[in-house]
Every structure is written in structure tokens, then in C-alpha cells.
């Protein structure tokens, strides 16, 4: 205060003002500061000072032929003096105005294409809605956010190659365009930018904006997707916020959002299968998001979310070194600990084996709606400073921190038995047991924690067991702060390992992630997610399982047919029939399976009874473990549309309808595809055509291995013999002819020989 009074006093004297405004600067240090180096030290001042001159701009001499010396108002537009040290002309800012109004106009067709990101932004803002301004304290925390809406997800190197190829195709230098997205973008951009007159450098800059994700570490309270970040300066200040709804979505946000949903669905599904890791990989590789392979997106997309990171770990990609517990991301900021197994007793005298972390450590905890700083010693919470959007979010963070601290009073606060299980019906590990228990009800935990008197610290208040704020008392070691805790800013990624139960560990063996950490929130994806894996058929309900199962049989009919006759057990055990079992009433599954398997065996034994339609229709029922019984069925029940519906053993029904003439299959009125090859009607034709160049030797001979399909015959060498499966599910022995000349006669003799071989 004193200094300010003194300065005011000085300024009131006229001499002070004069010295400060009129005298020249002749102090060597100052002159040095502003004149050494090429870097402009005070750009805004320099600009103001330059623009106050008459001719602040220099231009090529040609300008004098293209711009008149004076404008309509008679003001001079350029000077006859040339610029010192170059052969350029000195030009007035008025010349720019004249040029903008009267200069030549070139084609504008490329502008929206090159400056696409800007044009799109204008559209989003035009259609966006700005709501009221609210004045309130903003809890902002720095998060790594995407500041560049509408970009593809290429790496800097990939983008560089694309840009060089599009903008400077004739430049020397090796460019390798390998990824699908690189090739597509290059082709598209080359077509768009034909005969483009905009400066190549500008085009390159704009392409970079379109191709590469740019992230910044910014203070945010609210939406973090790129369409919100681009208006951050309009929507949140230090003490105010303005409601805003974006006027359009951008693909990069849609991909991030859909990727998280796909990853969560896949991890949830994989964790209940017999081999979670193998299943997860199979699903990641067979899933597409918005038409792009999920594995390609995972390789390029830096989104950090528990399920996404589990998928990345499974693919051998590096992920962030922070770990997840109770939906919060923990990052150790100092300290260290060693792990030791210890047995503890709950309040219900149940024994738990927990891995205790011995040592003093500090962590930041960042969740969706709350953040905290946690300091802990061995089985003791030293201090927790938490901030959050509302009471509920703050309570969630406190529960997670209390459980994580492993304090005895927390374990003693357990009432009742701990027996929580995961989706696969396996018991959760002790730490997650405790977490689930207190997430259900934390009353006893908060009551037993203990209370202390607190000092008055700016920006911090105490919190009582019933979650009310207080300035005098607080739960031991716990304070609520107005300030948020920043997210971990580093983008460093580490090598991790994953076990078959999808637990992800760092190289020291600390568990970073496990399926228990995957959120149960279900959203609706913005881009179409196509799961080709049979494990995901259930996600859209029973009807989808039914349609997909039959579609799979039809698509793979050639191989299915061979397995059906040669190796039925292997066929029945195929994982593609797994989802179907949930549609068959549990009590009767075994009987159905036994019945269908017996029926199929009769078909194999009695020649000429092979019935394509019936095999396709009944095959999924044979997958359940069979029960031997004498029961016969004329129809089999499946549970779809909320009730049991019947599939007729012989003939069509609303559930399964096969049209023999068109070979189209309709399931519940939905088209399930067309059977490419149906030998029932076209026996003689198919075989005689296909067996050209082969001699039929007689009945099947097991010494020549399993039967091949007609398509596989082409791989035989001349003179080689093989069993082959023909139309009616029958197997004959053939030999590939040594000479090509006799091929013509084969088609006539083939038909006769097949009949002889079979009969």
C-alpha cells in the first residue's frame, strides 16, 4: 500500500510525467535488450509504431503497375522511394484496402476445401446455442484436451508424408504411405486440390490441422470434447460460465466416444468368457467403428480410459503409467512403498488377505466429477484434500481414498459378509470387496473415521460424517478445497504386461488396471459399431443372436458341411454356437441336443437322406451337452420376443423360413442371407462340372485323409488321390488326371461313376 501511495505522489508532480514520457532512452542495457538478436522483443508496440508511419509495408515492384498511385479520395497508395536494402517499394496500408476492393479476383473454389476447418467451425458456431451466463465459483482443473475439432488421427510422421505427397509431390525424399487412412486421405486431397493457387505452405499448414490431433493442457470445468474446447474462452471464466450447445458433432469426438463404448462392451464380454484375453483380442480384431478397424483406431487414438487402455495393453501398445482404482486415476507424485501380504479382520470377523503398501506416498486422484490430493503412510491416511462438483462426487472420492488407505478403522467398519462377485461370478479381490461394500453404504465408515478440530485455512473447509461442510470440525485428515487438482500432464507411455484375466501390470508388477475398474455406464455410440465376433451377438438381444447364428452357418456352409460329415464333435463345440444356447430353455437343452445329434447320425448312415435345410436349421441345437433319451420332437422352442417361439423340425415356421427356389433364408421375417450352394436340386450338374480333370475311383478311402470340399480339389497334384465330399453329403475317392486331353469325357462318366460309387 505504501509503495502505491508513494508512486501516486510521484506521478502527481508534472516533472515526473515529463521525464517518463519525453526523455530519450539512452541506457546501454535497455538499448541492448531491444536491439540484439533477430527476435522482436515487443511485437505489439513495434506493430503500432510501424502502422503509425505512412508507408509501413514493402511490396514487389510489380505493385506499381497493378495499383494506381492514388485512390478515389486522392490519398497516395505507394511511395516512389524504394525500401532501403532491397529493391522493393514502400506501400501504404490504404493500398491493401484498394487491392481488397478492386484487385483481380481468382477462383474461390479451393477456399472452402483448404480452409475446411475454419468453414466448419463457422457452421458449428452458427448453429450452436448460447444459453444464460451464471456467476459462480469455477472449479477448473487442467486436463489434456483436444483443441482441434474435425481432425483425422494420423501420427505427426504419417501426416508429414501425406502432406508432402499432396502439396509437394515432386520433391525428393522417401515417402511411405502404408496405412489405409493415409492412402484414402492422399487420394481425396489430391483430387480436391487440383489446380489450387493458394500458397503451398498455407495448404500444408491447413492440412496439418485436418490430419493431426493437437492437444493442450488447459484448465477446464465442463465438457472436454474438442467442440467445447474451441469455445472455452466463451463458456467459462474465473467466476462465470455460459451454457453452450455445439452446433454440430465432429468425427474425432465421435470416434473417441464410440471407442470407449466399444472397448467397455468388449472388456465386459471378454471377462466372462473361458479365456478372457484371447476373446478380447478376437473381438478387438473383428470390430469396426464407423467403418474403421478398431485395432487401427486403438493404435492411433490417445484416449485414456480404463477399458480402452486394457484393449491397448492386450495389443502390446504402451499406455499411461497411472493406475486406476474405484474409477479414479491415481498418479504417484512422490514417495515410494513396498508391498507385503497381510491378513486383517473385518468388523464381521471375516479374514481378508490384503497387499499392504508400506511407506509414505503422495498421489493425485482424478475422477470425472471430483479430484483430490492424497498423502498416506503405511495403512494410514495422513491427509486428503478433495474438490468436486457436488456433495455426492466429493463423497465418492472420500470413500475411494479411505479404502485405498487400508486403515484399520475402515476394515473394522465392515458390517456383514463381503461376497461380491464379478460378471463371471468370481469373487472380487479384497480391495474391490471393501470398495463395493462402502460404495453401497458408507455411513458406518464415516461415523467411525474420527473427527478433529481444524484451523481456518483460506479456500479450505472441513467436512462432517454427514457430508455437511464446517469451519470448526472435520473428519480426520480430510478437507474440501475450492481448487481442483490438475490431471497428470505428461503424455509418457510405458510398456505393460497383461495376464489372461485382463489384469494390466507395469514392469514392477503393480496392477494398473483390471476389468473391475471398467465403468458400468452404458451410452449410445455416435458411430456405428460393427462387432463381427460371435461373442458380441448378444449385445443387441435374442433376435440378433438368432439371425447371426444362422447367417454364420450359411456363410460358412462349405466348411460346415465337411465338418458335419467328417468331424461333427468339433463342429458342435464351435464358439459360434455358444450365444444360441441362452435362447434354448435350460431344462430341455440336453434332450434337444441328444435328439438332433441322433437325427444327424442317421442322415450320415443312410445314403440319400442328407437334407441341407434341416441340417442348417437344427445344427445350433446340437451344440449343448447331449442327454440320451428316447424323446422325439416335432418342434423345438427358442425364447425370443419375450416368449417361446417354435422352430419346426420338418417345414417352415415364422422363426425359420427357407425358400428352396430362391435359396433365401428368413429369420423372424428378417432376411438372413442366401445359400450359395444347395446340392439338393443340382446334384448331377455340379459334380460333373467340378470333377472334370478327376477320375472317380470308388467309395471313400480313409487312408487318403479327411474329405476335401470341391473347391479344395484344385490344390491336388496330377496323379494325387483324395476323398471328396459331393452334393448329398456323400464322400468318394478321386484321382487328379495325369493328362489334360481326356478332361472332356470326365463330365459324362463322372455322373455314372458317382452313382456307382455311392450305391
From Swiss-Prot:
A single GO cellular-component term on record = virion component
The record's subcellular location field reads: Virion; Host nucleus; Host mitochondrion
The annotated site for Mammalian adaptation falls at 627
- Output one GO MF annotation: RNA binding
Coiled-coil portions:
none
Where the record places motif Nuclear localization signal is 736-739
Pfam families in the cross-refs: Flu_PB2_1st, Flu_PB2_2nd, Flu_PB2_3rd, Flu_PB2_4th, Flu_PB2_5th, Flu_PB2_6th, Flu_PB2_7th
Tell me one GO biological process term.
symbiont-mediated suppression of host cytoplasmic pattern recognition receptor signaling pathway via inhibition of MAVS activity
Assign the protein's first listed, main location to one coarse class. Answer: virion
InterPro entries per UniProt: Flu_PB2_2nd (IPR049110), Flu_PB2_6th (IPR049114), Flu_PB2_C (IPR049115), Flu_PB2_CAP-bd (IPR048298), Flu_PB2_middle (IPR049111), Flu_PB2_N (IPR049106), INV_PB2 (IPR001591), PB2_helical (IPR049113)
Q: Does the keyword Metal-binding apply?
A: no
Ordered alphabetically, the record's keywords are: Cap snatching, Eukaryotic host gene expression shutoff by virus, Eukaryotic host transcription shutoff by virus, Host gene expression shutoff by virus, Host mitochondrion, Host nucleus, Host-virus interaction, Inhibition of host innate immune response by virus, Inhibition of host MAVS by virus, Inhibition of host RLR pathway by virus, Inhibition of host RNA polymerase II by virus, mRNA capping, mRNA processing, Viral immunoevasion, Viral transcription, Virion
| TM region(s), chain numbering | none
Q: Which family does it belong to?
A: Belongs to the influenza viruses PB2 family.
Spell out the subunit comment: Influenza RNA polymerase is composed of three subunits: PB1, PB2 and PA. Interacts (via N-terminus) with PB1 (via C-terminus). Interacts with nucleoprotein NP (via N-terminus). Interacts (via N-terminus) with host MAVS (via N-terminus); this interaction inhibits host innate immune response.
Q: Which HAMAP family match?
A: INV_PB2 (MF_04062)
Purpose of the protein: Plays an essential role in transcription initiation and cap-stealing mechanism, in which cellular capped pre-mRNAs are used to generate primers for viral transcription. Recognizes and binds the 7-methylguanosine-containing cap of the target pre-RNA which is subsequently cleaved after 10-13 nucleotides by the viral protein PA. Plays a role in the initiation of the viral genome replication and modulates the activity of the ribonucleoprotein (RNP) complex.
- Give the protein's recorded name: Polymerase basic protein 2
